[in-house]
Regions:
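Residue-level recognition of secondary-structure-to-loop junctions
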Residues: 51, 265-272
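Bacterial N-terminal signal peptides
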Residues: 11-21
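Short, compositionally biased P/S/T/A/G/V-rich stretches that sit at domain boundaries
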Residues: 41-46, 137-171, 184-190, 202
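Short tyrosine-centred short linear motifs in exposed loops/low-complexity segments
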Residues: 55, 100, 110-115, 174-175, ...
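Low-complexity "stalk/linker" and mucin-like segments enriched in Ser/Thr/Pro/Ala/Gly
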Residues: 92, 200-265
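C-terminal edge beta-strand
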Residues: 289-297
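Extracellular acidic, Ser/Thr/Pro-rich low-complexity tracts
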Residues: 65-67, 183-190, 223, 227-232, ...
Length: 299
């Protein structure tokens, strides 16, 4: 009898605790899965390190802009700095939305050892840091180690594209300026063409109905390219443009293009005057080569 009474008491106590927890939980606002258009911060990210052919070391950094729509400009200075050796170590100052991988590389001496390279960003009232280091389990390959379905021989034989950008004299707000890139590649990996998705597996933008049915805060469902670069138009060599540094985004037309006779041309239109660093990325399906060009935009 005593055991039965004790069991009932324990059961009643547990039930009361569960009810209390549920009641308290009902008052809690969970925001982990909320998507914010704007007002959120940028988290710098250390992605790993790689030893170069000359013995020095490259540290790779990216970021997460927690906004789904708002792009941020954080100039070099108190709110965007890398130490030691900073504040400017070649980091980005313009931040597209969401996750961006291997945005820039900082080269450090071979004897970097147990030192750390600290990237600090201040945005939306929050201070975030990323710590670059040489821990053995953070060593990566420059291409990310991903060859997809390519053969080992093809991946090993592949070399990065060559990319040369023509200088840009300047630009005027609202007027398109021409961007020329000379690009070549070894033809590897062999282009395989786009894979056609199965019925029912198409991207949301191909299945959505009338414009009036679309949520106003979901630009990715509208098929809008807010990345500044866009996806590759097809398998094979292509050149993609983004803003690396600058006070605002630029409208690239087209944002990604395939070269013709070794030339890839696009235009950029700016809405805000200032100094911009535009980045072109030549991608062959596995490896990428980056080059920058500076543009001064006036009214």
């Amino acid at each position: 009898m005593r055991l039965t009474a004790l069991s009932r008491l324990v059961s009643a106590t547990v039930a009361a605790l569960i009810a209390t927890a549920m009641g308290a939980g009902a008052q809690v606002e969970f925001t982990n899965n909320v998507k914010h258009d704007s007002g959120q911060d940028v988290q710098p990210v250390f992605e790993g390190w790689n030893r170069t052919a000359d013995g020095t070391i490259d540290l790779y950094f990216g970021y997460l802009n927690r906004n789904w729509v708002q792009e941020l400009h954080i100039p070099i200075g108190p709110n965007n700095h890398i130490q030691p050796g900073g504040p400017d170590r070649g980091q980005a100052t313009f931040f597209y939305t969401r996750t961006r991988r291997k945005v820039f590389v900082v080269n450090v001496p071979a004897d970097f050892g147990k030192k750390e390279l600290i990237w600090t960003l201040v945005s939306a009232g929050k201070t975030r840091t990323a710590f670059g280091h040489l821990r053995p389990d953070w060593e990566i390959t420059p291409d990310g180690g991903s060859s997809g379905t390519r053969t080992t021989q093809e991946a090993r034989a592949n070399t990065p594209p060559t990319l040369v950008l023509s200088p840009v004299a300047g630009a005027i707000v609202g007027t398109a300026v021409k961007l020329d890139a000379t690009v070549s590649d070894d033809g590897l990996p062999v282009p395989r063409g786009r894979i056609k998705p199965a019925v029912g597996q198409e991207t949301p933008s191909t299945l959505i109905g009338n414009e009036k049915d679309l949520p106003s805060n979901l630009p990715w469902l509208r098929g809008e390219d807010r990345s500044g670069g866009g996806a590759q138009p097809a398998d094979g060599l292509a050149v993609r443009w983004t803003v690396f540094r600058g006070p605002a985004a630029a409208a690239f037309q087209p944002p990604t293009s395939k070269p013709t006779d070794g030339k890839a041309t696009t235009t950029a239109t700016f809405a805000v005057p200032g100094e911009y660093t535009l980045r072109a990325a030549a991608h062959d399906g596995l490896l990428t080569t980056h080059r920058d060009v500076t543009v001064t935009v006036t009214k």
